[in-house]
Regions:
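Histidine-centered metal-binding segments
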Residues: 1-21
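Short, acidic/polar
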Residues: 84, 143-151, 208-212
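Active-site cofactor/substrate anionic-group-binding motifs, chiefly glycine-
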Residues: 102-155
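Hydrophobic faces of well-ordered beta-strands that scaffold small-molecule active sites
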Residues: 68-70, 105-109, 128-131, 160-162, ...
């Protein structure tokens, strides 16, 4: 059964509900990797890596690099045109206050604030990132996610952050999850699509690895751990 939907801008939205052979391609992708992980082993290996490498990476150069990777974010219910303009102004002033440091990578805001940042941002080499797709829960219609993403890009966003549909993933609907990511990546085109796994809700290292593989398989340019709105797992 196939449904086609089209929204302003000509993007075609497709749902192909053939769960037999389609489902197998996702299982086939996962079968290429070891996804049966022991949580305690992962925890121990992670602790060992930190212990082994933290000292050598605790340097000014590494810290400068990490700072330059930051998406400076305001995602508050109290955000307004005025507050976001002021927030962006701090990024504009950064180069004068700290000439020896590279600026942040991006300013991240809700989609309706992309135009405000675009009109205010003067700093070089700082992108405009927008959360989209029913952030942070990802619980809305795919059509809404597509429209929201397209509007964010149209009004100035350089890159888009979405959250995987966690409910679909946990229920084994890999086709539904992957189709949605693929569709949003098609809207983004050459713009980066960053996919947030919401690891605190996934429950195990195996699930985190599966969600990572499926997200990248579906076109994610980056994967990220969490929105910060869900408690961490025990991992």
């Amino acid at each position: 059964m196939e449904h086609n939907h089209e929204f302003e801008g000509g993007h075609e939205h497709r749902h192909d509900h053939d769960h037999g052979p389609e489902h197998s391609k996702y299982e086939e992708a996962l079968a290429k990797y070891n996804i049966r992980l022991c949580d305690e082993d992962v925890k121990a290996k992670t602790a060992l890596l930190i212990e082994k490498h933290v000292a050598e990476n605790n340097t000014p150069d590494v810290k400068k690099f990490l700072f330059h990777c930051i998406d400076l974010t305001t995602l508050k219910c109290t955000d307004s045109d005025e507050s976001v303009m002021k927030f962006t102004g701090k990024v504009n002033e950064f180069v004068d206050k700290y000439p020896d440091l590279d600026n942040v990578a991006a300013i991240c805001v809700y989609p309706n604030m992309a135009e405000v940042v675009n009109d205010t941002l003067e700093a070089d080499h700082v992108n405009i990132a927008c959360v989209s797709g029913g952030f942070p829960s990802s619980q809305t219609f795919t059509e809404v996610k597509v429209a929201e993403t397209a509007m964010a890009l149209h009004t100035g966003a350089d890159e888009i952050d979405i959250v995987i549909p966690v409910g679909k993933f946990l229920s084994g609907d890999y086709e539904g999850m992957c189709d949605e990511i693929e569709e949003l990546k098609a809207v983004c085109g050459e713009h980066h699509l960053k996919v947030i796994l919401e690891t605190g809700a996934l429950g195990s290292a195996s699930n985190i690895k599966k969600a990572s593989i499926l997200s990248m398989y579906s076109g994610a340019d980056f994967i990220k751990t969490s929105t910060g709105t869900v408690s961490y797992t025990h991992l």
